[in-house]
Structure formats: structure tokens, C-alpha cells
Amino acid sequence: MASGANVTDNKQQTPQESDTLKRVWAYLKPEKRNFVLAIIAMGLVAASEGIIPKVVNDLLDKGFGGSYAGKLWHVPALLVGVALVRGLAQFASGYLLSQISNGVLLKMRMQMFDRMLHAPALFFHRNTAASLINAVIFEVNQVMQILTGVLITLVRDSLTVVALLIYLFYTNWKLTLVVAVLLPAIGFVMSKVNRRLRRLNREHQALTNTAAYVVEESVGGFKVVKLHGGEAYEMSRFEAMAERLRGYSMRMAVAGGLNQPVTAFLASLALSVILTIAMIQAQGNQTTIGGFTGFVMAMLLLISPLKHLADLNQPLQRGLTAAEMIFGLIDEPIEPQNGGLPLERARGDLVFDNVGFRYGDAARAALNHVSLRAAPGEVVALVGPSGSGKTTLVNLVPRFFDPTEGHILLDGQPIDRFALADLRRQIAFVSQDVVLFNDTVAANVAYGVHPREKIDMARVERALAAAYLTDVVKGLPEGLETNIGDNGMKLSGGQRQRLAIARAIYKDAPILILDEATSALDSESERQVQAALESLMVGRTTLVIAHRLSTIENADRIVVLEQGRVAEQGSHAELIGKNGLYAGLHRIQFASQA
């Protein structure tokens, strides 16, 4: 049973919280000016909190029959002014922080996508499409939303707490010390809950990716699901994942929910102690009615920001967990570039010299001591039973993987001496698994043209003509500018295959790799595609993987692979005459067609 993979490697050591926060801060540093302005704005909001109890204090002590009685109109004017400044400051801080977070979001998302594009092939074997889409599109957005919310609460409410504490010390320092004693107790409780919450968040995220992969499999394979009556099985799979997610969510709710009631209890305890001390002070004329009322009001105003700060723990841990995933992708090593030897256009002399390859920790090597040569312009067919190493061998040519033994030479030079981009410019690839993009016909044919360069439309038309697609394209609503839909869904199977061939023709690379390019087509489509392939192969070194042996009988040479080794090679006639593995495969295939 396949399961979703996380974009971070679980075997790696978990980053420390401080390390993750430092990395997030590194993205915020270029926005230091806006950040400082936002803090100033939030400072004004916090200062406004401390003004209110001071006004109440003076009003009670001086306003009612006291020296302040004739100036009571100042109070509403002051409150209106405070509200106006507070509102403007809140808007300014929100706008500035949104500008910062959206800038960081753009930078992170671009870095993630760039790293994903340049990751080695093994990375895509290790991670599912669902987990990568989740990371690039959703997780990075969640990180910025959560961390921005956390940042606003942390700065604004911390400043509010500071402003109110200053007022409290100014009003009655003895009572304030009681509050100060209880604050570390709140911090201690938060630190205890913190570690468990972070672990639960990390496990919840990994499970979310697995659930997304189940959905991806069900959607991508809907035909198989329906034909085989797999709805109940898929439902049970998804239900199991959903139940586990619910369990983790409840455990997180329990762990996170402890913060608020404990904080509220400690705050109530503090208030009870303060009331007791205040009553003792009142008996000794150490406080006034206004002073005590202002102090209690400031205390009550202090509870809300303290509660907000206590509740920060759960979203902060969720944001840090998602940030770890994002940084795991950003830190993913790119493909090894190796040498920088330039390569304009190769002759196409391709040599496999004692090549071996093993996938990771696999028990058996996929290739063993493979030696063969494809001369410039030669068509070499690779045949053999499933699992014999045909696809692995051709995947080594564009360096999707590097051999674990031996060397591959192009025009006499090991391919890892060439600049990777230059090497891949020499290779065109047409597979049975056609990949087309949700774009126009022209953009698909000229795929890989730099965005700043203009597509050569005349060259596109020539490529389409060589692929026998001119009439098809003329029949489309907007011709070359017609959008072909997701993976070319607006075209038939044969048309999609020929469009992939047109893309290879447009590229005009000296080396061509054909991987079962006609295996999934009907007879008429195969005839058209085969004709297009024949025009494509002219003058190019071609490696052809084929199960249907009738399609490669005219190859210059046929190489038969068995269990990762070259079993035999020669022309079709020579191999039939040897009466070996190829002749046996040929007999079986043609007997089944008779």
C-alpha cells in the first residue's frame, strides 16, 4: 500500500524551534523598515490601553466634586481622540504586516517551486504529487497566515501588557509584584504543553499528506476504481485516514485547550490575592478609590492580552511545523551539475561503458555491466522482459540518475563533464505516458523556449506538418492558439502522441529516446504516429524501447536485456537466426497475435 510522503525527510534530525524562527526572521529582515513602522503603530494601540484606566482613576479621585469637576468635557474629547488614534494605528499595523507577509509568501513560494524544479529525479520518487502541491500552495500560505497572526498578537499584546504593567507599577508597585510572581507560572505551564503540541502537529501534518495522497490516487485512477468496484475499499481507506486525523485533532485540542483554562485560573487567583492586599492597604489609607478602581481595571484589561499570548502556543506550533516542511523543501539538494564543459550540438556518438545501477538500497542491481554503443544516426532498439532494465538504461542518458558503476560517454566525453543543461538540450524524449501542458498548441510544441524569446511559429508549423497534425490543428477553434486543456484532454490519444512527437521535432535534438511511444494506440493512430516517428528519427541517434517487436524489426541494431544485463545484440535477422531470447520473445508475441 502506497502512502503519502512528506517533503521533509523523517530521518533527518528535527530542527530546533529557535532555528526555525531564525530562518523565518531572515525572510522578515529585508522588510525591517515596514516592520519597525508596524511595531510603532502597534505600540500606539498598546499605549491607548493604558490611558483608559488612568482617565478612570483621575475621574473618580478628582472629577466628582474635586478639582477636576469643571473640566469634565476633556474626558469624552480625550476618549474620542484615543479611539481615532487607535483605529488609525490598527489599520496601519495591519496593512504593513500584510505587505510584509505577502512579500515573504511570494519569496518562499518562488524558492520552493524553483527548488522543486531543480530537484533530482529521486526526489520525485520519494515524494507524492499531493504532498508537494500541499507544501507549495497551501502550507506556505498557512505558515504566513499563522505566523502573521502570531506576530500581530505577540507584538501588540506584549506591548499592551508592558503598557499596563507600567501603569500598574506607577499606581501600586506592591500589588503589581504579585502579578509579576504569577507570570512565570503561566510561562511554565505553556512550556510544558509546548513540546507535546509540536510533536502532535508534526504527526498530524504527515497524516494529512497521506490522506491527500489517498484522494489523489482515487481521483487519478477513477476509471479503475469504478470498473473494479473499488468504491467501498477506497472509502474504507479514506475513512481510516479521516478517523486518525480526527483523533490527532482531538489530542491537539486537549493539549492546546489546557492553556486557556489554566491561564484564566492563575489570573483569577492573582485577582483574588490583589483584592485581599488592596483591602488591607485601604484600611491604612495607602490607596484611593480611583487608584484601586484604575488598578483593577488595568488588571482586567491585562487578562485579555495575557490570554491571547497564552493561546499563541497552538497556532505557533502549527505554523512552525508547516515552516519545517517548507524549509525541508527549500533545503532539498539540487541535481548535481558536475562539469561545466560546454556542448553546442553533439554528433550523437553514445557509449555505455560497463554501466551498473542500483536504486537506493534495492537488493538487486537494475543494471549490471552494460556495455553497448549507439553510433551517430543509428537506431538501437532495447527489448527484453519487464524489469530487465530498459527504462533505467535510457533514464541514465539525460542524467535523471547517475550510474553507480561505469561511465556513459557522448562523443568520447563522460556525460557528467558536460553542463547539465547543455547535455539535456541534446536529447528529445517521447514516451507512451504523454505529458502535455494546459496551454496552447504552439506553446506545447515549442515547450522550453525562454519566456523572453518569441516562439518561431513557422518552425512550429513545420514540426506539426512532420507529425501529421496540420489538418487537426486547422480544425481547432483558434488553430495554434487553441488551449488543449489539462494534459491535452481536448485531443484524442493519437493526436496527443503526435503532438509530443511534434515537440521533439521542434527541439531538433541529435539524440532521440522513444519509450513505448506507440504501445497504447489503436491501429490507425499507430500508423500515423509510426509515420511521424520515422520522419523524426532521420539523422538522429535513437534509442527505442518497444514491447511490440514488429515496430523495431528495421532497427539498425537490437539489444536484448535480461535481468539488467545485455543478453544478446544484433540485427533482427541475426537474432532470429541465433534462436536465443529475442527469437523466443518474437515467437511468443507473434503466436499470440495469430
UniProtKB/Swiss-Prot annotation:
Coiled-coil ranges from the UniProt annotation: none
According to the entry, every stretch annotated as the ABC transmembrane type-1 domain falls at 36-318
Q: Name one Pfam family in it.
A: ABC_membrane
SUPFAM superfamilies referenced in this protein's UniProt entry, alphabetically: ABC transporter transmembrane region, P-loop containing nucleoside triphosphate hydrolases
Key word Ribosomal protein present: no
**Any idea which UniProt keywords this protein has?**
ATP-binding, Cell inner membrane, Cell membrane, Lipid transport, Membrane, Nucleotide-binding, Translocase, Transmembrane, Transmembrane helix, Transport
Quick one: which residues bind ATP?
A: 384-391
Enzyme class label: translocase
Residues annotated as transmembrane: 35-55, 64-84, 135-155, 161-181, 262-282, 289-309
Q: How does it sit in the membrane?
A: Multi-pass membrane protein
Function summary: Involved in lipopolysaccharide (LPS) biosynthesis. Translocates lipid A-core from the inner to the outer leaflet of the inner membrane. Transmembrane domains (TMD) form a pore in the inner membrane and the ATP-binding domain (NBD) is responsible for energy generation.
Write down the PANTHER family for this protein, in alphabetical order.
ATP-BINDING CASSETTE SUB-FAMILY B MEMBER 10, MITOCHONDRIAL (PTHR43394:SF1), ATP-DEPENDENT PERMEASE MDL1, MITOCHONDRIAL (PTHR43394)
Q: What is known of its domains?
A: In MsbA the ATP-binding domain (NBD) and the transmembrane domain (TMD) are fused.
What is the protein name given in its UniProt record? ATP-dependent lipid A-core flippase
Q: Which organism is this entry from? A: Cupriavidus metallidurans (strain ATCC 43123 / DSM 2839 / NBRC 102507 / CH34) (Ralstonia metallidurans)
Gene name linked to the record: msbA
